[in-house]
Design a protein with these regions (language model features):
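Terminal low-complexity, intrinsically disordered regions
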Residues: 1-38
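C-terminal structured domains
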Residues: 20, 24, 28, 32, ...
Length: 201
């Protein structure tokens, strides 16, 4: 709940007036929202934040992003700030924050909309057919860049997910899919190779 409604936290050197004890924080947030007639969302997947960026020249993935949305915006902010704080914390609980990246042709008018529609379709299928039925993870959001699309995931069982995602993505031979940890400097994992790729070798 705190990630949804608290933008930032600063450490104080001494107790301040009107400070709230951590065990009382949830009740305080809930009471404040009710008092202002606001709806309470305690499931992060119920609230998505949209964002827009100016694409940058950078060798790292995601710096070409123009727009995206996320139900875990602090993780996105950590990535661009070069921080692994949230990534490491999630990893400490056995969860793996990752994203799927797939390049697309962006040469003609309408290419961006076409791949964006495809990304939405793929996100829906991933959630309904892979992530939710067996509790493999959560869909966190996605983004579109100038030449690459991204789908953001939080995996609870990465090995089981990997077993299922490869045959799943073979339904889309027109794209090349890669998996990366949700942090800068990560290695890319090619999720599968087409027959054309193998013949080129």
């Amino acid at each position: 709940l705190s990630y949804q409604y608290i933008a930032s936290v600063e450490r104080a050197d001494a107790p301040l007036e009107n400070m709230i004890k951590l065990p009382e924080l949830r009740a305080y947030i809930t009471d404040t929202l009710k008092a202002h007639g606001k709806e309470i969302f305690d499931n992060p997947q119920q609230v998505y934040t949209s964002y827009r960026f100016e694409p940058q020249e950078n060798e790292e993935l995601r710096f070409d992003v123009m727009a995206g949305s996320s139900c875990f915006q602090p993780l996105v902010a950590n990535y661009y700030n070069g921080s692994t704080e949230l990534f490491d914390r999630l990893n400490g609980f056995g969860a793996q924050a990752v994203f799927i990246a797939f390049p697309y042709e962006n040469k003609e008018e309408g290419d961006g909309k076409k791949v964006l529609d495809f990304r939405y379709e793929l996100e829906d299928r991933l959630a309904a057919e892979l992530l939710e039925p067996e509790g493999l993870g959560l869909l966190l959001g996605g983004a579109i860049g100038t030449g690459t699309c991204y789908i953001d995931l939080l995996l609870f069982d990465e090995s089981a997910f990997m077993e299922k995602i490869v045959p799943f993505l073979k339904d889309y031979p027109q794209y090349h899919f890669y998996l990366s940890d949700f942090r800068q400097g990560s290695d890319l994992c090619r999720l599968y190779e087409t027959e054309d790729d193998e013949s080129e070798e």
